Amino acid sequence: MASVSWRAVAVAMVVVLLSLQWFAKGYPEEDLVVRLPGQPTVGFKQYAGYVDVDVKAGRSLFYYYVEAVKQPDSKPLTLWLNGGPGCSSIGGGAFTELGPFYPTGDGRGLRVNSMSWNKASHLLFVESPAGVGWSYSNKSSDYNTGDKSTANDMLVFLLRWFEKFPKLKSRDLFLTGESYAGHYIPQLADAILSYNSHSSGFKFNIKGVAIGNPLLKLDRDSPATYEFFWSHGMISDELKLTITSQCDFDDYTFASPHNVSTACNEAISETENIITEYVNNYDVLLDVCYPSIVQQELRLKKMATKMSMGVDVCMTYERRFYFNLPEVQKALHANRTHLPYSWSMCSGVLNYSDIDGNIDMLPILKRIILNKTPIWIFSGDQDSVVPFGGSRTLVRELAQDLNFKTTVPYGAWFHKSQVGGWAIEYGKLLTFATVRGAAHMVPYAQPSRALHLFSSFVSGRRLPNNTHSSTDE
């Protein structure tokens, strides 16, 4: 009996010690993803689950977090948000672009993404706002939302997420995303900096903002699309001249109807009829199937044109099929409320404010930079939805407003002895870079160049202006 009692006590002590050791690591055991169905063996940990952002309303956001492949005790933390608005960062960023896995062709397994950004950083993906993916609210009125409430919920999310992961509170934090995240990320960064200025306790260790092909200012981004079409030989001189002379983009808004002339709307409609029937707007060189994330950009384009467009969904099925497998949802601790609809790349219940798409992000970006937070804007050069020309112009205007001098002149940057794109730096805090051969979803179209750009960003390195080999692989 004594021997049995001793063994029982010993076992109990081991359990307690293991529990203490686990929680000392600062990670929530209940959110650990032991293994995803069909997942290859990897050496890093994954976590997924919910964070309540409004307990009274029953509003919760779903997240997926992956540790860095190497040196997890010293790597920074990077948040990634996809756009839409209303599209999933898990179906998009995590499992189509920059996360550690891609679904296989049959939609039942996973394969390793050798260019995953968790080579350089811990990665956090959030389905935001509520109504996207597995994020939800018990109040249907919460699905009528916009930029301000989305930023507020994300601030609350991060504060409570760090309570789950206290070990990461002091890590360098980078905020990244693409497309309509050109609205999400700046407003979240602004909210974080405001929180830091008023907090006498915990402060976010925010170190930088990077956004790909971002919607920043509609009256610059919209005309850039038609300039891109014309410069690539996709529309005629006559149509380009009509748009230039008849469309006052300073008065162009997302809300329908556009506050523009009939001649302008007719010219835009003619352009869309020509382009969308034959060309993938998100990669004008691509004529094959495209990933599920294209749905998020379709939303952005529809908001601007109010036109019906066809989408090649051949790769959408893989993601949708995989994430609707019961065993996958169980492994991810997802869909805990048994939502009355299946998981989809973009929300069918969200009613996001069209008007918020008109908000000028440049004043917010200026405030972020005045807080000494670096900003990188990067653009795939084959994207016509938010073309690099508009983004480059906006970055230059922002630099002029800040009275920044050019600290690195415009020129090529290199990766693996090839031109990776072109870049310019202003005031040592503001960088614009193109990614050669990339499209709207830069990490998907050019994964190696995207990883090199990202690694440079989080490491505080400038993009190399010579053919020396990259240091991130």
From Swiss-Prot:
Keyword field contains Nucleotide-binding: no
UniProt-annotated catalytic positions: S179, D383, H440
UniProt keyword terms in alphabetical order: Carboxypeptidase, Disulfide bond, Glycoprotein, Hydrolase, Protease, Secreted, Signal
Annotated EC: 3.4.16.-
Alphabetized Pfam families for the sequence: Peptidase_S10
Localisation per UniProt entry: Secreted
Origin: domain of life: Eukaryota
Species the sequence originates in: Arabidopsis thaliana
Cellular compartments per GO CC: extracellular region
GO BP terms in the entry: proteolysis
Gene: SCPL42
Glycosylation sites: N138, N259, N335, N351, N465
Positions of disulphide bridges: C87-C346, C247-C264, C289-C314
Region forming the signal peptide: 1-26
Predominant location: secreted
Recorded GO MF terms: serine-type carboxypeptidase activity
Family, as annotated: Belongs to the peptidase S10 family.
Protein name listed in UniProt: Serine carboxypeptidase-like 42
